């Protein structure tokens, strides 16, 4: 978490989350960032995830990609977490030039529970295709 690299204006300053805030992402990366605390969906009939994203990654063959997972919020302290569902399994793109809004319904298995969101990123080991990465800002869950 920190300031975005130079040349990428933020939707709302001063911070965002990204793959590497100081340089291009590394080869063979496997990183994740979870929401701090839990999100209460115990009374929810439906829930929508919204966030702003800026994507600049190798999308040749979808080997470099972002993933958004929903985790059981009561099971985050151990070495193993329980996945309740995948919101998006294959976020890719190459230099869109602007922040864009991501919107998706959370899976039914998450409703009625305390949850956490996990934003994961993996990359291949091809040296000629590293890029800035995946940056996320203004995350919110709309509960209905």
Regions inferred by a protein language model and the residue ranges of each:
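Extracellular glycan-recognition surfaces and repeat-rich motifs
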Residues: 1-29, 61
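Short beta-strands within extracellular/lumenal beta-sheet-rich domains
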Residues: 24-42, 99-103
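Extracellular/lumenal carbohydrate-interaction signature centered on repeated Trp-anchored short motifs
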Residues: 27, 39-47, 94-96, 109-111
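Extracellular carbohydrate recognition
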Residues: 28-31, 60-61, 124-143
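Extracellular ligand-binding interfaces
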Residues: 45-88
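Extracellular carbohydrate recognition and processing domains
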Residues: 78-110
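Low-complexity, Ser/Thr/Pro-rich intrinsically disordered linker/stalk segments at domain junctions
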Residues: 104, 108, 121, 134-136
